[in-house]
């Protein structure tokens, strides 16, 4: 089980990313727009740098919903590999069967 502080930090990052997403998209559009003046684009770049670091969605890490484990997490289920195995063996994931060939 991951420390609770790390799990809460990830939740905070997700909240910040959602909160600043429109502002970040607007600034990036200005930066990429070649028709804008160089000063406008530069000021937009400076303003983008002033946003909180954790508002960048690339800083978010996928974690297991049950244990908070940061590695070996399957996006489709939102669970770590070992928890998927436990739950799948109990038959609690519909349509998931053990592979055999």
UniProtKB/Swiss-Prot annotation:
One of its GO terms (biological process) is translation. InterPro entries: Ribosomal_uS14 (IPR001209), Ribosomal_uS14_bac/plastid (IPR023036). Belongs to the universal ribosomal protein uS14 family. The gene is rpsN. One of its GO terms (molecular function) is rRNA binding. This is Small ribosomal subunit protein uS14. Gene3D superfamilies: 1.10.287.1480. Part of the 30S ribosomal subunit. Contacts proteins S3 and S10. One of its GO terms (cellular component) is cytoplasm. SUPFAM superfamilies: Glucocorticoid receptor-like (DNA-binding domain). It comes from the Bacteria. Pfam families: Ribosomal_S14 (PF00253). HAMAP family: Ribosomal_uS14_1. The keyword Amino-acid biosynthesis does not apply. Disulfide bonds: none annotated. The keyword RNA-binding applies. Keywords: Ribonucleoprotein, Ribosomal protein, RNA-binding, rRNA-binding. It comes from Paraburkholderia phymatum (strain DSM 17167 / CIP 108236 / LMG 21445 / STM815) (Burkholderia phymatum). Binds 16S rRNA, required for the assembly of 30S particles and may also be responsible for determining the conformation of the 16S rRNA at the A site.
